[in-house]
Swiss-Prot record:
It catalyses: Exonucleolytic cleavage in the 3'- to 5'-direction to yield nucleoside 5'-phosphates. It is found in: Cytoplasm. One of its GO terms (cellular component) is cytosol. It comes from Vibrio atlanticus (strain LGP32). This is Exoribonuclease 2. GO terms for molecular function: exoribonuclease II activity; RNA binding.
Length: 668
């Protein structure tokens, strides 16, 4: 008799209007209830019935009321959906289409679904991977949630899923852009290309590399100085700023590098053929010649020019490294001419490396972890590749080339695409000094560490220490690297200027710098200058690509290490992060990241403290682990659904009865 009673409805509305309301974000749990997080210190419990109106991540206004002597939140108004476009798996419930989002906090959420027009629902099977969108939401007045499937990514059991799903998740392309039938060189009529085909340039790359974008030549002078010439592939010879292909390249930003495969920024017929500096093939190139002193100082005689070049030798990193390090390579024996060039390049690189070690910042050597895949996308092996002498030779050449470009772009235009880093965050300077000065022989000052020279001095001092604890801690006080259209220093490298132009096949920013360098050569106005948004655009692309690379890696690690907990395989692991819940480590053998909860170090909250600010783990107030430490671990869990690893130390800290505060260590 009370149903649809307008007086009751009015009374209910009046009561609700008098109740307090809070705005916040929904945090779901696996147990059906949730929380309204108002700020970092305030949250309200949401009972399971109210959670049916919202999903994890929704920004809402909720009524705060007291139920069973407890304040609870009832979501009332949707401000912003937390879930719009998402990746999901098909779930058939009594033959009807449903989807389950592929998200750790949403695994229990099963949503009714429909296929969009043009997508046949009969093609969707249990477990298939799809892209879906929320099209109905209870807080918008709809009767429950409804998802629309817009795209099928791949079948449930397809081994390519880690790549295709991750790319779809980040809204990234999974194939190269479509090329054109007839590429034509579109050089400015006044651009003269110097014939450099007689110069014995060499390329040094991985054995499987196809998009070879740099060739090198060096000659040691009688006085010990080096004449270095860097030749870089020239895709802007074929692509003008107003071409459709330029728009595609800008939208992609970079070639996407994922474990086991890449997605090119440019069509493969350009990247792997017409622009690739293939041995004995004439190619258009943008070149830079500069003198580097025997002490590693880059001279003022920087000269950029356009050329036609020919690679005289296609070399591989490992073969060149073997030859440089041992005097011989089983798979490669250079001619006398090529041997002399490689030797001169190596000596140049050693001089530059020594200069950077003394005057700039050299990053510590860490292995590159590489997945070896079978033809059907199974992981055959994970290789830890150290940067060897040939890799460092190329690296020093590229860094020198990019310093040259930075100088020229700054002097000619005061504009370009520059890689920048501003050092420490201004609000963290006191923290930096409090951390390092008790350890440093000569105390640092705030005035000193805000300068490029002082920052580099501090970084070099950190690099000289016999452990990486302070280095790991201080990273949290540093600013993020940026891409700017105005010249600025790169503190993290210890360089006053840095503008990349050495990978135009793979980086859109390098294409812009090529066009500006050609304008410098021609003494003309550039056909393209970087606008104010390009830095943020490229940084966002780089962030999404980095996330995709990590996500695919996590998936492959979970597959590869699935049996490690049962087999109790022992790994050496380095601590790279500590927070109040535990610590994150990297397995040195394969590069996998794992989490060690505090409870798996010692299951006694009274005795153990994981301190994220200090970067330490203490038991009974005595430090047992710190950032940078290497310890032995075993994996206790490999979660295939969430693609994460949980580890525990083999060192056991016994849970002692109350008494003298000592730690009792045993071996697992």
């Amino acid at each position: 008799m009370f149903q649809d009673n307008p007086l009751l409805a009015q009374l209910k509305q009046q009561i609700q209007e008098t109740l307090p309301k809070k705005e916040g974000t929904i945090k779901a749990t696996e147990k059906g209830f949730g929380f309204l997080e108002v700020d970092s210190k305030t949250s309200f419990f949401i009972p399971p019935p109210y959670m049916k109106k919202c999903v994890h991540g929704d920004k809402v206004i909720a009524i705060i009321r007291t139920e069973k002597e407890r304040e609870v939140a009832e979501p009332e108004e949707l401000i912003e959906q937390g879930l719009t476009r998402f990746i999901a798996r098909v779930k058939l419930f009594k033959g009807r289409l449903n989807v389950v989002p592929d998200h750790p906090q949403l695994k229990k959420l099963q949503l009714k679904a429909k296929a969009k027009k043009g997508l046949n629902p009969e093609t969707l099977k249990e477990g298939d991977w799809v892209v879906a969108h929320i099209v109905q939401h209870p807080l918008k007045g709809d009767n429950g949630f409804l998802a629309q499937i817009s795209e099928k990514i791949t079948d449930a059991d397809d081994k390519i899923a880690p790549w295709w799903v991750t790319l779809a998740q980040n809204d990234l392309p999974n194939s190269e852009p479509e090329g054109i039938d007839d590429w034509q060189i579109k050089d400015d009529a006044d651009l003269e290309r110097v014939d450099m085909t007689h110069v014995p340039f060499v390329t040094i790359d991985g054995e499987s590399t196809k998009d070879m974008d740099d060739a090198l030549y060096a000659k040691k002078k009688e006085n010990g100085d080096f004449e270095l010439t860097i030749a870089i592939a020239d895709p802007t010879a074929y692509i003008s700023p107003d071409d459709a292909m330029d728009k595609v390249a800008r939208e992609r930003g970079f070639t996407i590098y994922l474990p086991g495969r890449n997605i090119p920024m440019l069509p493969r017929d350009l990247a792997d053929n017409l622009c690739s500096l293939i041995e004995n093939e004439v190619r258009p190139a943008l070149c830079c010649t500069v003198t580097v002193s025997k002490d590693g100082v880059i001279g003022d005689d920087i000269n950029f020019f356009a050329a036609n070049i020919k690679s005289h030798a296609r070399l591989a990193y490992d073969h060149v490294s073997d030859w440089l390090e041992t005097g011989a390579s089983e798979k490669w024996q250079p001619s006398e001419e090529i041997a002399a060039i490689v030797s001169d390049l190596h000596q140049f690189a050693q001089a530059r490396s020594a200069w950077r070690s003394a005057n700039a910042v050299v990053f510590p050597d860490r292995p590159d972890y590489r997945f070896e895949l079978s033809e059907d996308n199974d992981v055959v092996a994970i290789h830890a590749d150290m940067r060897r002498s040939a890799n460092k030779l190329v690296e020093e050449s590229m860094i020198s080339a990019n310093i040259c470009a930075g100088r020229v772009l700054k002097e000619s235009f005061n504009q370009g695409v520059f890689n920048c880093h501003s050092g420490f965050k201004a609000e963290k300077l006191t923290d930096v000094l409090e951390l390092v000065n008790p350890e440093a022989e000569t105390p640092f000052t705030e005035e000193q560490i805000v300068s490029l020279e002082g920052f580099a001095t501090l970084r070099r001092w950190l690099g000289s220490l016999d452990n990486s604890y302070y280095d790991n801690r201080i990273r949290k006080f540093q600013a993020y690297s940026e891409i700017s259209n105005e010249p600025a220093p790169h503190y993290a490298m210890g360089l006053d200027i840095y503008a990349t132009w050495t990978s135009p096949i793979r980086k859109y920013g390098d294409m812009i710098n090529h066009r500006m360098l050609k304008a410098h050569i021609l003494r003309k106005t550039p056909t393209q200058t970087p606008d104010e948004t390009i830095g943020d655009e490229l940084a966002l692309h780089r962030r999404h690509h980095g996330m995709a690379e990590r996500n695919v890696g996590d998936w492959l690690y979970a597959r590869t290490l699935a049996n490690a907990p049962v087999e109790e395989t022992r790994f050496q692991a380095e601590i790279f992060d500590i927070n109040r819940a535990g610590m994150r480590v990297r397995l040195l053998e394969n590069g996998a990241a794992a989490f060690i909860p505090g409870s798996l170090i010692l299951n006694n909250k009274e005795r153990i403290e994981c301190n994220g600010d200090m970067g330490t783990v203490s038991i009974d107030k005595e430090m047992v682990y710190k950032l940078g430490d290497v310890l032995e671990v075993v994996l206790s869990e490999v979660n295939q659904e969430n693609r994460n690893l949980v580890a525990k130390p083999t060192q056991v800290f016994a849970d002692l009865p109350s008494g003298p505060e000592t730690t009792n260590e045993t071996e697992a």
